[in-house]
């Protein structure tokens, strides 16, 4: 594991940069089962749709459960829902749009709020069938069930455009623990992070802190003994 320079180590941003270095040696669920992991996609459109569906399912749900639900959708959506000439299997806009909400719900029944997400997924597919996949934030957040956090990740992973910092519970928790921000909600955290974090760090900060929050800086009983900044973190148990 490398180390940050002396100048970089100063202040909360320096603590984050050291976490970034430690993350290079950590494989977390977000690295192997996050929204950017899109196996078996045959086209760019299908890859982008996979990312959007994964993000929709991910709220209040662990990456492992979301990943399993995605696999079930790819495997279990009925072939009768495919259009003429469409390859068999896979997760496509047409297959979802042509599927019953009940069948979609059965595929994703282990994710949080699956009833609502099944209905939203069906509606999204119907919208995308008419309008195509979105490329702008305003179009993304107009879709049912898609908020700022998901839209920012979609823009980054599906469109290769980083327009902001996506903040979830891990990013919010760790940013406050290390003193990078002093905020009470994720939207305030997003605004403050975009103010204090250099733009060159925006693309990766979500993955870095989510993975760190899944493995080391967990919500309850954080593993401070394994943390590279345990002697300097203001929230350290050491």
From Swiss-Prot:
SUPFAM superfamilies, alphabetized: DNA-glycosylase
Site (Important for catalytic activity): 168
EC number: 3.2.2.-, 4.2.99.18
Cofactor: [4Fe-4S] cluster
A GO-annotated cellular component: mitochondrion
Homology family: Belongs to the Nth/MutY family.
Covalent S-S links between cysteines: none
First-listed, main subcellular location of the protein, grouped into a coarse class: nucleus
HhH domain ranges (all copies): 129-155
Cofactor note: Binds 1 [4Fe-4S] cluster. The cluster does not appear to play a role in catalysis, but is probably involved in the proper positioning of the enzyme along the DNA strand.
Keyword entries, A-Z: 4Fe-4S, DNA damage, DNA repair, Glycosidase, Hydrolase, Iron, Iron-sulfur, Lyase, Metal-binding, Mitochondrion, Nucleus, Transit peptide
Species whose genome carries this gene: Encephalitozoon cuniculi (strain GB-M1) (Microsporidian parasite)
Functional description taken from the UniProt entry: Bifunctional DNA N-glycosylase with associated apurinic/apyrimidinic (AP) lyase function that catalyzes the first step in base excision repair (BER), the primary repair pathway for the repair of oxidative DNA damage. The DNA N-glycosylase activity releases the damaged DNA base from DNA by cleaving the N-glycosidic bond, leaving an AP site. The AP lyase activity cleaves the phosphodiester bond 3' to the AP site by a beta-elimination. Primarily recognizes and repairs oxidative base damage of pyrimidines.
BP GO annotations: base-excision repair, AP site formation; nucleotide-excision repair
Reactions this protein catalyses: 2'-deoxyribonucleotide-(2'-deoxyribose 5'-phosphate)-2'-deoxyribonucleotide-DNA = a 3'-end 2'-deoxyribonucleotide-(2,3-dehydro-2,3-deoxyribose 5'-phosphate)-DNA + a 5'-end 5'-phospho-2'-deoxyribonucleoside-DNA + H(+)
GO molecular function: 4 iron, 4 sulfur cluster binding; class I DNA-(apurinic or apyrimidinic site) endonuclease activity; DNA binding; metal ion binding; oxidized pyrimidine nucleobase lesion DNA N-glycosylase activity
Active-site residues (renumbered): 149 (nucleophile)
Binding positions ([4Fe-4S] cluster): 217, 224, 227, 233
Protein name: Endonuclease III homolog
Localization, UniProt: Nucleus; Mitochondrion
Domain of life: Eukaryota
